[in-house]
């Protein structure tokens, strides 16, 4: 019991340190104002979706979100996950598998009325599991509260 009490504060500090790193590194990679947008990480039976929605329909922020996700989708299709690695850390769950499995999945960019999204789709079950792990890690780091709110079918 005493060990649990000692370990918990360290876990909270590690989480805080991770949050701080994500905020600092995210602002260096993402050109839009994160306080004006919400990240959503939505798993599906065949992969998942990363969606960024601008809160107040600000056209400048929407354009910045779209430019960012268009660029990220092109990188992901090539197996380049350097931006998520920089933002979340190189040990991010699922990251290595996604980078090495780019030939076994399709990556699609699409615009939404208030932002944009990227879909990651595969028929390879281990890769789908890696996508889910990667989405869950982003959900934890961004604390968006959107994981599993929608189980999209692709």
Task: Indicate where each model-derived feature is located.
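Intrinsically disordered, low-complexity terminal tails/loops enriched in metal-binding residues
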Residues: 12-154
């Amino acid at each position: 019991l005493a060990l649990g009490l000692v370990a918990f504060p360290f876990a909270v500090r590690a989480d805080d340190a991770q949050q701080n790193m994500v905020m600092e590194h995210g602002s260096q990679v993402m050109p839009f104002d994160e306080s004006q947008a919400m990240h959503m990480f939505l798993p599906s039976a065949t992969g998942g979706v990363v969606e960024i929605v601008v809160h107040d329909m600000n056209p400048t922020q929407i354009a910045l979100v779209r430019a960012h996700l268009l660029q990220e989708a092109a990188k992901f299709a090539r197996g380049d996950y350097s931006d998520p690695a920089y933002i979340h850390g190189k040990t991010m769950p699922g990251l290595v598998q996604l980078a090495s499995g780019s030939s076994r999945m399709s990556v699609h960019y699409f615009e939404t009325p208030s932002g944009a999204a990227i879909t990651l789709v595969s028929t390879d079950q281990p890769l789908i599991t890696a996508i889910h792990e990667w989405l869950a890690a982003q959900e934890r780091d961004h604390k968006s509260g959107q994981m599993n709110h929608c189980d999209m079918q692709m």
